[in-house]
Amino acid sequence: MVNQALKIANISKEQVDAVAFTRGPGLMGSLLVGTSFAKSFALALNVPLIDVNHMQGHIMAHFIDEGQEMPEFPFICLTVSGGHTQIVVVKEHFNMEVIGETIDDAAGEAFDKSAKILGLQYPGGPLIDKYAKQGNPTAFKFTKPRVKDLEFSFSGLKSNILQLIQREQKKDVDFIEKNLIDLCA
């Protein structure tokens, strides 16, 4: 994979100035593998090793492209992914403060788990979005999370969907198929 990445970048190993890796947050197994490889690769090349915060990387990646206008600090950013949902005050490039986040499942995780309940393929978020555009958002009522301040909670929505499906499939085994777009909306 490294050779392929170097080929795409049109550089040789000797032209690598530093090795960057994600130190977290994230899944422990992936972080350990990435960290171990990055340390070994940097050591072999005798170049500096740079650790990067995963969520800071997501936020600042939007400003990497040449010609892209740099942001005016401070700004507020909503980061939503499979594993994280956060509101972040970005004070400077490496000075960020999380002011709100999920207390349970991240939004992306809730989408993927709900999609699985509905029998949709992974990743489920894009499929739910596609079907939701065609559906009736008022066809089904789900409870709203009770959270404080700038917190998020998505586990209740996932549980509501599961309970609704289990209850309605007892009456009609084709319930999901007949109501998919409205369930997604």
Q: What are these model-derived regions, one by one?
A:
Residues A38-H58, T102:
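Short, acidic/small-residue loops that bind anionic groups at enzyme active sites
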Residues V52-F75:
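Conserved phosphate-binding catalytic cores of ATP/NTP-utilizing and phosphoryl-transfer enzymes
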Residues F21-L45, D65:
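Short Gly/Thr/Asp-enriched flexible loops that form oxyanion-binding sites at enzyme active sites
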Residues A18-A20, S30, M70, F75-T79:
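Short glycine-aspartate micro-motif
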